[in-house]
A protein has these predicted regions:
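Catalytic-core signature of thiol
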Residues: 1-186
Length: 186
């Protein structure tokens, strides 16, 4: 965020490359374990989506190329679970924050517009075991009195919210966050 440029990074890089073997992840379905991906990116960097685009399905043939690294991580910290002010400060002053969510509900999978509200969970910021998907909070706002996070999502744009998706602010959805610093290469 320091450069004012939003660089789209390669999801496929993390799906294909040894992040799962090296950092104890068995499949892509464990995507909510963001710290494993952070450790991999700290050690290797991550390619841009332009140089290593997403391919539907599991390829597992690593095509990582250190010459096309779009970002590295110098470190990351955990934000107190459920602390919405701490998360707002992190997004505003440091940069993107990753968030684990349950993306298995029909409401999320078929979301089209407006502020999405998870009606399945009543966690109110508490940890629960149904985190299946990682998204990145890049901003926040208010619409019709409802506070929300603006998220970057790796799902495709067909049938759901695609890359940018507003979700209700700690109403029921967000339970685990990490903030990290990117070094953006130009």
């Amino acid at each position: 965020m320091k450069t004012g440029k939003l660089v789209t990074l390669s999801v496929q890089n993390l799906v294909d490359c040894p992040v799962y073997r090296l950092y104890n992840m068995s499949t892509c379905t464990t995507g909510n374990y963001m710290h494993h991906a952070f450790e991999y990116v700290m050690a290797n960097g991550i390619d841009t989506d332009q140089s290593y685009p997403y391919i539907d399905g599991d390829n597992y043939k690593c095509l990582y190329d250190k010459r096309t690294v779009g970002a590295t991580i110098s470190g990351y910290v955990n934000i107190t679970t459920g602390d919405e002010l701490e998360m707002q400060r992190a997004v505003a002053t440091v940069g993107p924050v990753t968030v684990g969510i349950d993306a298995t509900t029909d409401g999320f999978r078929f979301y089209k517009s407006g502020v999405y509200k998870d009606t399945k969970h009543e966690c109110k910021g508490q940890y629960f075991d149904e985190l299946h998907h990682a998204v990145t909070a890049v901003g926040y706002g208010t619409e019709n009195g409802i506070h929300y996070w603006l998220l970057r999502n790796s799902y495709t744009t067909s049938g759901n919210c695609g890359e940018d998706c507003p979700l209700e602010l700690f109403g029921q959805t967000f339970v685990t966050e990490s903030v990290f610093e990117w070094e953006i290469r130009q």
